[in-house]
From Swiss-Prot:
GO biological process, one term: proteolysis
UniProt KW keywords: Cell inner membrane, Cell membrane, Hydrolase, Membrane, Metal-binding, Metalloprotease, Protease, Transmembrane, Transmembrane helix, Zinc
Enzyme class (EC, first level): hydrolase
Family: Belongs to the peptidase M48B family.
Location(s) in or outside the cell: Cell inner membrane
GO molecular function, a single term: zinc ion binding
UniProt name for this protein: Protease HtpX homolog
Cofactor binding, note field: Binds 1 zinc ion per subunit.
Cofactor requirement: Zn(2+)
Record field: transmembrane: 7-24, 29-46, 145-165, 174-194
Enzyme Commission code: 3.4.24.-
Transmembrane recorded as keyword: yes
PANTHER family, per database record: PROTEASE HTPX (PTHR43221:SF1)
């Protein structure tokens, strides 16, 4: 089912990409956009996870350097009944995390240095479980493809500023100044709306399943509250440079969108916390974090 959703998404984003190309360069622009889109579809399926990790400067965690963290992730993956994903660390003080990969067998979880410093081991377990839920649900390919295409559509729309008003070799003049300006605004907005629809619909489900994986909904609820508060005060420079990836994070890392609920990439954090607290009232509780002592590990 995950591949079906991803195929539909690729078709929608490809159509949007072709539309932008046609508006910029008429028939020739559409043909060029089609060729680019075909290449992007292949690239995003096989390599988009590595591209996103590279955008954020993530480096793979050595199990010997952070055994407690590594064992925590492995224990949660075992509890979720899925393969152990690769584990990456992002060197930023903002607490946050995301998952990526085309399927559970080829997946990665990336956490920030700020997350490991600001949260308790229990809260980190809640966050990791949320990301594992995205992987198990096969949301990660969907979100990574969206991020790649949204960024490309935004760049293509910006090209319209330079080429949109000029005539092509057939004498066509697809866009004037007004059309160019409209395209620069509307194309990224359309891509962003697709991102928002996907992220909002999947976050609640990942919260629910993540809480089941770690066995303590309140661990994740507490983590979300801390991350939300700190993310609004601490910069994530690489996320600001790559806003198309914002919907992949557990909490929106962008300051500019933090209070804009109309165009938010995530559901309201207070509502997510309330849902987890309601879940905790009737849920059986796990007694400990999988395979890790109840202390701060050597990952600070």
């Amino acid at each position: 089912m995950g591949y079906v959703r991803t195929g539909i998404l690729m078709a929608v984003m490809t159509a949007l990409f072709l539309g932008v190309g046609a508006l910029i360069g008429g028939q020739s622009g559409a043909i060029i956009a089609l060729v680019i889109a075909a290449g992007m579809n292949l690239f995003t399926f096989w390599n988009s996870d590595r591209a996103v990790l590279s955008m954020h400067g993530a480096h793979e965690v050595d199990p010997r350097a952070a055994p407690d963290l590594y064992n925590m992730v492995r224990g949660l993956a075992d509890r979720a009944g899925m393969p152990m994903p690769k584990l990456y660390l992002i060197e930023t003080d903002q607490p946050n995390a995301f998952a990526t990969g085309r399927n559970p067998e080829n997946a990665a979880v990336a956490v920030t240095r700020g997350l490991l410093r600001a949260l308790t081991p229990e809260e980190v377990a809640g966050v990791v479980a949320h990301e594992l839920a995205h992987i198990r649900n096969r949301d990660t390919l969907l979100m990574t493809v969206t991020a790649t295409f949204a960024g490309a559509i935004s760049m293509l729309a910006n090209f319209a500023f330079f080429f949109g008003g000029s005539s092509n070799e057939e004498g066509e003049r697809p866009m004037g100044l007004v059309g160019t300006l409209a395209l620069m605004f509307l194309a990224p907005l359309a891509a962003g709306l697709v991102q928002m629809a996907i992220s909002r619909s999947r976050e609640y489900e990942a919260d629910r399943i993540g809480a089941e994986i770690c066995g303590r909904p309140l661990w994740l609820a507490s983590a979300l509250g801390k991350i939300e508060g700190l993310a609004q005060r601490i910069d994530n420079v690489r996320a600001e440079r790559n806003p198309a990836t914002a919907h992949m994070f557990i909490v929106n890392p962008l300051h500019a969108m933090g209070h804009d609920r109309l165009f938010a990439t995530h559901p309201n954090t207070a509502n997510r916390i309330a849902a987890l607290r309601a879940m905790a009232e009737g849920a059986p509780q796990a007694s400990r974090i999988p395979r890790v002592a109840a202390r701060r590990g050597p990952w600070n």
